[in-house]
Amino acid sequence: MAFVAPVATVRATTKSSVCQVQGRSTFAQFSGMKKVNQSSRLQPAQSGSAFGGYSDANDAFYTRVSGIVAATFGPTMKVRVAINGFGRIGRNFIRCWAGRSDSNMEVVCINDTSGVKTASHLLKYDSILGTFDADVSAGEDTISVNGKTIKIVSNRNPLQLPWKEMNIDIVVEATGVFVDAPGAGKHIEAGAKKVLITAPGKGDGIGTFVVGVNEKDYSHDKYDIVSNASCTTNCMAPFMKVLDDEFGVVRGMMTTTHSYTGDQRLLDAGHRDLRRARSAALNIVPTTTGAAKAVALVVPSLKGKLNGIALRVPTPNVSVCDVVMQVNKKTFKEEVNGALLKASEGAMKGIIKYSDEPLVSCDHRGTDESTIIDSSLTMVMGDDMIKVVAWYDNEWGYSQRVVDLGEVMARQWK
């Protein structure tokens, strides 16, 4: 099913801004289990310089994200965004977006069947993130975040949502239900122009993008429905691209040790996957994942070369990806780590983080980057078999990339 997005009305102030990329700059912080920077991959340049004194590598990343180096934008468009589904990713999205003073998106509506009071409460108080350091309040059919009013609607049928009446540009589809073109396309039938799915897309008619890897391929005219892939694909794809470019990947196997998710059962109960039917709090649960194969959607040279499984474990957040691969080029541990360190400081700064400390999962909670290389665990067997271990905050880091992809879409708005 193909959809053609109508030309959107420009709704914005008439300011112009020179934009650049910066790895991790603090815009706002929330208080919780630890202080965390809320960062934007696309940020205003420092005064006095089009590039703000940052490296050529950062400028190169800017080129990939926006398609323009040191470009002065005309009327800055605030595209109108609605969120369908206000669960873990939906609420993380709001926190990430609220921390960006330069966002070209304006969240104006949330579809949540739990109601205004619950939506407001769960946004403010979070067992993983801690209390949101923002002014959050509930009205009759709205919530307010730092003075910005967001309408709350409640309808399980996307065709009946008020996207046309509210002039919605982008729907962030965060239910995990409408992940194919016919399902996500219902938002467009209801009046939205574009759909951004916060899960792997299924079937044809959906563009898959991983920021830092292939977001330069996004085209406003070509894609009406896009997917931000999965959190695990966002972890794997950046470092697999680096290793494939540097050493030439022949084949590989991945295991992700993944925190439990809302799709599992707290206590034993029915589920289509009999392993996921067992208590998430008590078991290591082996299950399937398409994350490894999906890497090929954004790194085509890896098509048919990767596969893997997931082990769901009794932790609420932060996961770790273990990839063993055969490569063409003979190498050694220090060379592998050197390539990953170089990427983390250069072209993939803000996407790959490099760690040489003996840390555990809780230490990575709230990390903005998509992947954290645990360099002490890198191994090379013989001279052509590599093992790389990478952590990722499967909620927060992923949600940062959803916001980033939304910004990529917004900056091409017509």
UniProtKB/Swiss-Prot annotation:
Site (Activates thiol group during catalysis): 258
Catalytic residues (positions): 231 (nucleophile)
GO molecular function, one term: NAD binding
One CC-aspect GO term: chloroplast
Any one Gene Ontology BP term: glucose metabolic process
Interval spanned by the transit peptide: 1-76
InterPro entries listed in its UniProt record: GlycerAld/Erythrose_P_DH, GlycerAld_3-P_DH_AS, GlycerAld_3-P_DH_cat, GlycerAld_3-P_DH_NAD(P)-bd, Glyceraldehyde-3-P_DH_1, NAD(P)-bd_dom_sf
The enzyme's E.C. designation: 1.2.1.13
Keyword Glycosyltransferase recorded: no
Protein name, UniProt field: Glyceraldehyde-3-phosphate dehydrogenase, chloroplastic
Naturally occurring in which organism (per UniProt): Chondrus crispus (Carrageen Irish moss)
Gene from which the chain derives: GAPA
